[in-house]
């Protein structure tokens, strides 16, 4: 397939995006970016009972947060005429036929087939109906749903992830494309959009493989050629269960992760490498991530998303962030204490918002922990005059060691507790010049400063 690729991310605005949806969007975006192609956002909103403008707006907000800006946009609810035209062609060609069974009748058929050891495949009884039969059923108040008549053949395609794939049409029921109330199900609008927008590559989860075999038949029935397909492994939760919009929104929705303070590029970095043999590496640029992206490296086995892994990558991303990148966000938090402050604290950040906590350690008020007042008094007396720099800590602690005889942990931990009120934190050689002599002396004296 020649020319620049066109890919699409096609969410249904019936709920919030979770990390599995984000992975689908990211793969399509990175593939387009790497190959100088177009990334399309398509709202699959034909389910007007469950689709809402609020969910649609939330999807766009989530993608913007991730940095995944679309080049093309479509909304299926605006394209019903195109789907009607495609359905009319399929009806005229005898590929779309009316069926009148109720859900209960179909369920009884399936149970009888399974009881006889047969696969629960629709028996095409509707194809045997005469015009008189159909008229009688409609007079009874029944409205037809419309099924696509599959060719009972093996549909083969070369998948960029799975390799050679075949879907046996004889093992499938003829899919329903139009409901009794005239609304379109997912399949036909998706096919028509892929044709009309010249989508070259469909990149989606492996749960769509069977559906792809069906869609290829519909595409060809409409006189078009199918795109290239890539079906990657599915992303499960940490317990190994598939993610869902309904059940996992509180834990794994993009909104929840954003509200928790995770960096968008940390999530992008993790999702881009999960399911590949490559180590996850923190990355602060989508261009850099796209340059590394190789769709052939995606695996076939389902994988798990663990928030603990995201926390590790988030920390690593913050460690890579320059002061110039951090400066406006520090200012927004009210804790821009300068480049030296940022360089001192960033090795200890898990979330960016932690910077505000370390600013309070520097500026106070800090409630010091004084376990040995005599030691603290000796340390205060040994404080050198300002100005201070990174060498001050070593000079001061040498003086305290000489004055008290303390060394190792017995020397350093009481100083940390007195200066910060904490048992851990950034290196004190970097924090001490930021705290300054006045605050350091006060804290060593047991004062909350």
UniProtKB/Swiss-Prot annotation:
Residue interval(s) of motif 'KMSKS' region: 242-246
Transmembrane feature ranges: none
Motif 'HIGH' region positions after renumbering to this chain: 11-21
Subcellular compartments: Cytoplasm
Top-level taxon of origin: Bacteria
Keywords: Aminoacyl-tRNA synthetase, ATP-binding, Cytoplasm, Ligase, Nucleotide-binding, Protein biosynthesis
The protein's Enzyme Commission number: 6.1.1.17
Main subcellular location: cytoplasm
UniProt entry tagged with the keyword Protein biosynthesis: yes
Binding sites annotated in the UniProt record for ATP: 245
Gene3D superfamilies in alphabetical order: 1.10.10.350, HUPs
MF terms in GO: ATP binding; glutamate-tRNA ligase activity; tRNA binding
Catalytic activity: tRNA(Glu) + L-glutamate + ATP = L-glutamyl-tRNA(Glu) + AMP + diphosphate
Keyword Transmembrane helix assigned: no
InterPro entries noted in UniProt: aa-tRNA-synth_I_cd-bd, aa-tRNA-synth_I_codon-bd_sub2, aa-tRNA-synth_I_CS, aa_tRNA-synth_I_cd-bd_sf, Glu-tRNA-ligase_bac/mito, Glu/Gln-tRNA-synth, Glu/Gln-tRNA-synth_Ib_cat-dom, GluQ/Sye
PANTHER family linked to this entry: GLUTAMATE--TRNA LIGASE, GLUTAMATE--TRNA LIGASE, MITOCHONDRIAL-RELATED
UniProt-recorded name of the protein: Glutamate--tRNA ligase 1
Organism: Parvibaculum lavamentivorans (strain DS-1 / DSM 13023 / NCIMB 13966)
Taxonomic path: Bacteria, Pseudomonadati, Pseudomonadota, Alphaproteobacteria, Hyphomicrobiales
Gene this chain is encoded by: gltX1
